Structure formats: C-alpha cells, structure tokens
C-alpha cells in the first residue's frame, strides 16, 4: 500500500511539472525545456512565476559551457520583453550579483539558509536572464584550461553563441523585444555584445534577427583615462581627502596613459599622493557606496555560529548580503535545485573568479566609438550612475556621455533636471537626441538596485517601456 501511495505521488509530480512546463497555449513542443525547470529553491517563498536554470554548451569540443538562470516576469510573461543582465569584474557572477543581491526576485536570508522576496525585483517589468560569463565565472566552465585566458572579444563572441543557442531552448523569445543591461565592467561587455548582435543582424537579410531594443549600463567603465581621475575628484568633493592632496593628484598625475593593470608612467609625487589617499580613506569605507557601513566577516560568522541572523543593516541595506549569498549558493541542495555544478568543479562557488587570466589591457579600450555605432543604429542607450559610488563615479560617466552626444551632433532633448520616484527626487537626468540618456540615482551604490531598489525599478521600467523619467514635480512642500 505504501509503495502504491508513493507511485501515485511520483505520477502526480510528473504531471504537475509537465503542465507547468507547457507553453502558454498549452503546447509542450513550443514550451520551455523541462529539464531546466527549477521547481523550487531551498527556503524559497511561494511564487507564481517560473524559474529555469542550466547550461548552454558554447563549444562542445573544448567542453566550454555557460550557466544561466532565467526568471519569468511576475505577470504577463508572454507579452513582456526579455532582459539579459551581465555583471562586470571582469570575472564576477551575474547569478550571485544581479540575480541574488540586486534585481532578481529573491535575496538570501540572514542565516544564509533560505530566501526572502525582493519586492522591487525587475521581473515586475521584464523576463530576466542572468548569465555567468565568460567560462570560469561562477558555475560556467571549460574542460580546456586555455579557455580561461580570455578577453573582451572572445567574451562577446561566446555570448552571441549563447544567446542563439538559448533561444533554441526558449524559441518563443526569438521575436520578443530584447534589452541588454549590466553594470561596472559590463560597460565593456554590454556594448560589445550589442555590437556583435547588430553585426549579426546586418548579415541575416530575411532570416532570424535579434529584436534589440535598447541597452542600459550602470556605473560603467567606459574610458579609463576619464573614469580613473573621476575617482579622486569624487574623494575630494566628498571630503575624503584634503584640498592639498586633491590638487596634488590632479596636477601631478597624468591619467592619459593609465592602464587597467599596471601603474601608468606616474611621477614619484603622484605615486606618493595616490598611496596617501588610500591610507587616509582607510579600508573601513565601502568604496562601492561611501554612505554604507562595512560588513565585518568575523562578526558575521560569529552570529551564524550562534545561530543568529548574520544580517547587518545600514541605511536599510543588508551590508552582509554578499557573505549570505556566498554561503547559500554553496549549499549542495541549492546547486542541485539550480542544476548547477554538473561537473563537480574542484572549487567553491565565489562571486568573482580567481581562475581567469583576463586580458586586462582590454580595460583600456574606449567604449565611446562602439556606443556611437549602437546609437547610430537607432538603438537607445541609457547610462545610469549611483551617486554614492567612488569606484566608477558619475563624474566621469556624465562627461563621457556628453562627449558622445557632442560627437553624434545631438541636441539636448530633455534638459538636465531632477526626476521623481514616489514624490521624492530619484536622481537627475539629461537626454540627447531622443536616443542617449544619462541618469543618476540618488543615494545609490555602484550596484544601483542593491541600495536603491525602488528608484532602480522605476528607472528600469521607464527604460524598457521607452518612457522618459518623470520631471514633473510633486505638490509643493508646506510647513
């Protein structure tokens, strides 16, 4: 009798999974891949949308595969667009970053054993696809060690192959509006992927083409010789270094020949000033958001050992979330639920890879010419900046967007001014030529959705809907 009961339950589960995996028209042949369906993550709250995760083989001979995590839109997924999100680094995980600490539907709980809902998840506005790229990041891997020596060009080509093969798994998205988004070094990843997609489209005549509708990049690395001096301008303007030290750095440091990996040809005075800046600011400042407190790993681990919540809140933000997601994603039951780590990698999951031998000289490349090609193809470009980030501050991004607008001979179509979210200033925005937008997000970190989820969702929703950020002022304040 017991065996019959278990058999009945097994059949019921299979039927449920098959029904859940069917397409919206009930046609399984046109549906999503059953083998990649994530029925439920450990400790996950109940949700109505579906999740999928697994691998896409990029090069079977080399044994190179990229891991993805896909989340349906919360409502009307059949009509909402598809957004690909990429984290930067280079070499950091879009699953650990974008999906589980920023804009995905779940955050880890303070005990690192479960999940809680993110009420401002971007899947309210779009279907979301997160990919760990290149191979060697997160659970993406290669059986050919030389593949871990890589750079921007090969990363973009692999991502093009990934998108083509992922769409074979999910064919109903072939005609869907596609948006590309990311942050930090994705200021290289996203424009270069958009560029190869547009090149691919140009060669396709009447065959399949990507329906690319826009790209959005947050606190992006665009041009190193402008983004680096912006760091020290930020330190000075926020009172983190003295007037004298700020002037010394600005006058003695030639950032024109700065490189991504090595000290540029700097004077002794410049070197001493830069080192002094690091000493004054100290390691106890969160460079990604100077307002937030830092998380002390030893205290976090002590709390967990005492079976307390390891969460530490600062300005309403869990500053220990990166440690929580590290522990959560290394749980065997989590990896099993995500169909991850299928080759039993000989190392733990980590947010940023130590395997990659990335071509860091690629970081010196100027992304403005690529962005110019994208805009000239009538694909809208949004650059957004959390204004508390000192790593890639808004000061550099804003001047670079203006430089790009001037190069395109664009007029200002929306003058620089405040935009509003829930009656409060969400940030400031300017638009050029109806195709190029720069927006700040007030009070936001390098990882904008992490520290300002409501404002980030408002910005993202406006982006995918093709709307301008609202300039309309709220009612006047009264005493």
Curated annotation (Swiss-Prot):
Tissue specificity field: Expressed in seedlings.
EC number from the UniProt entry: 3.4.16.-
GO cellular component, as recorded: extracellular region
Active site residues of this protein: 184, 389, 446
Any one GO MF annotation of this record: serine-type carboxypeptidase activity
Sorted UniProt keywords: Carboxypeptidase, Disulfide bond, Glycoprotein, Hydrolase, Protease, Secreted, Signal
GO biological process: proteolysis
Disulfide bonds: 92-352, 253-270, 295-320
Entry protein name: Serine carboxypeptidase-like 44
């Amino acid at each position: 009798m017991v065996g019959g009961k278990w058999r009945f339950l097994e059949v019921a589960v299979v039927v449920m999974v098959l029904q859940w995996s069917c397409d919206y028209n009930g046609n399984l042949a046109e549906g999503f891949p059953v083998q990649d369906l994530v029925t439920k993550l450990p400790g996950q709250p109940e949700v109505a949308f579906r999740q999928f995760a697994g691998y896409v083989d990029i090069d079977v001979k080399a044994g190179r595969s990229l891991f993805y995590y896909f989340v349906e839109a919360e409502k009307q997924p059949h009509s909402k667009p598809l957004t690909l999100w990429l984290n930067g680094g280079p070499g950091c995980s879009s699953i650990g970053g974008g999906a589980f600490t920023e804009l995905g539907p779940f955050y880890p709980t303070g005990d690192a054993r479960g999940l809680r809902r993110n009420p401002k998840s971007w899947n309210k506005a779009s279907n979301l696809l997160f990919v760990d790229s290149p191979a060697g990041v997160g659970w993406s891997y290669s059986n050919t060690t030389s593949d871990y020596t890589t750079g921007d060009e090969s990363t973009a080509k692999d991502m093009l192959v990934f998108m083509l093969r992922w769409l074979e798994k999910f064919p109903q998205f072939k005609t869907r509006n596609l948006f590309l988004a990311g942050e930090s070094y994705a200021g290289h990843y996203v424009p270069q992927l958009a560029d190869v997609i547009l090149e691919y489209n140009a060669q396709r005549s009447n065959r399949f083409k990507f329906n690319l509708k826009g790209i959005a990049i947050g606190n992006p690395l665009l041009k190193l010789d402008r983004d680096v001096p912006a760091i020290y301008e930020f330190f000075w303007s926020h009172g983190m270094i003295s007037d004298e030290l700020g002037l010394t750095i600005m006058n003695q440091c030639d950032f024109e020949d700065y490189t991504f990996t090595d000290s540029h040809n700097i004077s002794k005075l410049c070197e001493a000033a830069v080192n002094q800046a690091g000493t004054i600011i100290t390691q106890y400042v969160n460079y990604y958001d100077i307002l937030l407190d830092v998380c002390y790993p030893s205290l976090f681990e002590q709390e967990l050992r005492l079976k307390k919540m390891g969460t530490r809140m600062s300005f309403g933000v869990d500053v220990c979330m990166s440690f929580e997601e590290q522990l959560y994603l290394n749980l065997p039951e989590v990896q099993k639920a995500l169909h991850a780590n299928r080759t039993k990698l000989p190392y733990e999951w980590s947010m940023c890879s130590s395997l990659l031998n990335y071509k860091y000289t690629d970081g010196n490349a100027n992304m403005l010419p690529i962005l110019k090609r994208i805009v000239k193809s009538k694909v809208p470009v949004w650059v957004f900046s959390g204004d508390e980030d000192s790593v890639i501050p808004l000061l550099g991004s804003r001047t670079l967007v203006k430089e790009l607008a001037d190069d395109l001979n664009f007029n200002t179509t929306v003058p620089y001014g405040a935009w509003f979210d829930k009656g409060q200033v969400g940030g400031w925005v300017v638009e050029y030529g109806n195709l190029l937008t720069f927006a700040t997000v007030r009070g936001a970190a390098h990882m904008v959705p992490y520290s300002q989820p409501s404002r980030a969702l408002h910005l993202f929703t406006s982006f995918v809907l093709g709307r301008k950020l609202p300039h309309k002022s709220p009612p006047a304040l009264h005493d």
